[in-house]
């Protein structure tokens, strides 16, 4: 049987050779039938301490490595780039100012 693989975002890298990965999934509410986001955190083994907070990683199920670690980092899908996030925020702020300047939003 193949091992499970999940994709998530690194939320903590403070431990040696261990990262905490938050994995989001959509679950349908039993009564209201609306889809709701659920987040679960997994401790994953990072052999070379490569992962940093904000990186998107793929983790794979493995044998128990410690009391809480049952996953290992397979690969880093995307590195976190703070410059890109700041640029996107600036672009959004400029768009908001342009709309407000034209009188698009009334007070």
Curated annotation (Swiss-Prot):
Job description of the protein: One of the primary rRNA binding proteins, it binds specifically to the 5'-end of 16S ribosomal RNA.
GO-annotated molecular function: rRNA binding; structural constituent of ribosome
Q: Which UniProt keywords apply?
A: Ribonucleoprotein, Ribosomal protein, RNA-binding, rRNA-binding
Please provide, in alphabetical order, the Gene Ontology terms of the cellular component aspect for this entry: cytosolic small ribosomal subunit
- State the protein's name: Small ribosomal subunit protein uS17
Family statement:
Belongs to the universal ribosomal protein uS17 family.
Matching entries from NCBIfam families are given as: PRK05610.1, uS17_bact
Its BP terms in the Gene Ontology are: translation
Q: How does it assemble?
A: Part of the 30S ribosomal subunit.
Q: Which InterPro entries match?
A: NA-bd_OB-fold (IPR012340), Ribosomal_uS17 (IPR000266), Ribosomal_uS17_bact/chlr (IPR019984), Ribosomal_uS17_CS (IPR019979)
Which Pfam families does this one have?
Ribosomal_S17
Task: Tell whether Transferase is among the UniProt keywords.
Answer: no
